[in-house]
Amino acid sequence: MAKDFINGKRTQFGNKRSHALNSSRRSWKPNLQKVTILVNGKPKKVYVSARTLKSGKVTRV
């Protein structure tokens, strides 16, 4: 399963609750993008969440 290279975000799991409070499993997936960034001075392709990109924690090469 892919995860965010910077924050470590990955798919979260929980329950979907109906109006009658029946439960069924569901998942929340982060918006991961494959980007090239500099890691230790060398370009590397990694998965980064869109939120991390927007916050400016990483810059594309």
From Swiss-Prot:
GO MF: structural constituent of ribosome
UniProt-listed Gene3D superfamilies: Ribosomal protein L28/L24
Cite the record's Polar residues compositional bias ranges.
9-25
Please provide an example of a Pfam family that matches this protein in its UniProt record: Ribosomal_L28
Q: Which UniProt keywords apply?
A: Ribonucleoprotein, Ribosomal protein
**Per the record, GO CC terms?**
ribonucleoprotein complex; ribosome
Disordered, as annotated region: 1-26
Q: Which GO terms describe its biological process?
A: translation
Give the protein family: Belongs to the bacterial ribosomal protein bL28 family.
List, alphabetically, the HAMAP family matched. Answer: Ribosomal_bL28
- The protein here is known as Large ribosomal subunit protein bL28
